[in-house]
Amino acid sequence: MQNTIRIVGIDPGLRRTGWGIIDTLGNSLRFVASGTVTSDGDMDLASRLCQLHDGLAEVVHTYKPDEAAVEQTFVNKDAVATLKLGQARGIAMLVPARAGLRVSEYAPNAVKKAVIGVGHGEKHQIHMMLKILMPKVEFKGDDAADALAIAICHAHNRGSNRMREALAG
């Protein structure tokens, strides 16, 4: 008998970190909640990272997910922005890991492929597919929608991830 698995998907960002919670049982997906954690751009970097940490910790405490998935970041031309995004991503991985969750990582094109079938889709396509896959879905903004897509990607790939880990030793 299968158990329901609760997954938190996290779309890291220094200004806004999106989060989405879904329940999965076999192939079925059920929307639970979504939102964003924001940091105050007028504060210093350490304080902003603390805001992200505290906000995500509250999400994990409230919804008690079983597993976590975080989107991998890309390197862009602005090295400082890339480093700051990497620090926010570190918080996004640390919070669920400290709560004892297994944290998986997915490239943006893998997330899009899992949700819309191709690796290079548009935001509106993701929004539309979220509504098809989970008719009761609610999200405010792209960050929360992306986080839900990350959670769905993990739901579709969690079995293959376990197989890879088992084969790796």
From Swiss-Prot:
It is an enzyme of class 3 (hydrolase). Its main location: cytoplasm. Disulfide bonds: none annotated. It catalyses: Endonucleolytic cleavage at a junction such as a reciprocal single-stranded crossover between two homologous DNA duplexes (Holliday junction). Its cofactor is Mg(2+). Binds 2 Mg(2+) ion per subunit. Mg(2+) 1 binds at D11, D143. Pfam families: RuvC. The keyword DNA damage applies. The active site is at D11, E71, D143. Its EC number is 3.1.21.10. Belongs to the RuvC family. The RuvA-RuvB-RuvC complex processes Holliday junction (HJ) DNA during genetic recombination and DNA repair. Endonuclease that resolves HJ intermediates. Cleaves cruciform DNA by making single-stranded nicks across the HJ at symmetrical positions within the homologous arms, yielding a 5'-phosphate and a 3'-hydroxyl group; requires a central core of homology in the junction. The consensus cleavage sequence is 5'-(A/T)TT(C/G)-3'. Cleavage occurs on the 3'-side of the TT dinucleotide at the point of strand exchange. This is Crossover junction endodeoxyribonuclease RuvC. It comes from Rhizobium leguminosarum bv. trifolii (strain WSM2304). The lineage of its organism: Bacteria, Pseudomonadati, Pseudomonadota, Alphaproteobacteria, Hyphomicrobiales. The gene is ruvC.
